[in-house]
């Protein structure tokens, strides 16, 4: 919602950073290739590519390391996001009298993040794959109904003339020149600072790099996280391809009905929103503030339930990826091959808790949601791309080459933020 608010229709290109079109590559051939292996995890799949020699084992271990780092990054991202989101709906002034210790204003989102992450952790440990699937189905149904209602409300309360008067020239145009050319001066001056801090002013150069990087990331296949686990959990290679193909077709129209609806309502009625956090305007609070201000009674609860269900299912899928790799690919393979199932289950519980605690500690140092997202999609995935493109398409790449390529990429991703502060 924040991206649509600030960049208008040009924001449709920014998700290419992830990239959203990787589902095309998965649907056409990559999901089928992966599912035919009949393995349980992405790290285990690496051994089918490079064998069981020294290079194959090192490649296997480095994929596990990458998967765990990615899990920590995504959980820190979710921790910061859910904290800022819930701060809007549960005002600190109401909660603080019941908290037996002092929490500085700037750390209130972190307090909420810790609270809701703890609840989600118990859900992960008590639930299983079936609960995640049903939670996904339930939250999608809720969000579909909510998205249609919000889109209709936006159409009823925002006229084209009012939207045009509240936005800068070019906001409604998806196309662009060398520069972004969006000047919010005289409308909402603070948005200009947001554009500068995001670093998207030279939009053509940014777009070309984003497109090139997106094609490479898509060709590299899914990272060893819950996306790959869902592909490997499908019934057959055909269903794996169908699942990947239907994701964008089903999800995108519903998602953008709600995004665009809240964005235009927030722009036209901007003065009615409370975006202050710790004494400053935080544009990452646009979605919860717009929900609180514009969603009718009843619909607000429906949307909130759907978004929390989405957080819970995504959180559960992400957390479950860590014990899957560490228990199945490290402990069971190298430490205790004959371990009893009960012991493996208990170890999975322990690893799940440790992963959540570590990611929460990382999240305490994160200043914004966007900074974590940029590191994940630019830093960590940048280090992942080259080795994983070559593993599919260059038959001469061996396990040692893959291992060293991944290791250098991971180290570079970890060192880049502290060495080049402000770049990511």
In which residue ranges do the predicted regions lie?
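Membrane-embedded helix-loop-helix hairpins and adjacent transmembrane boundary segments
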Residues: 1-424
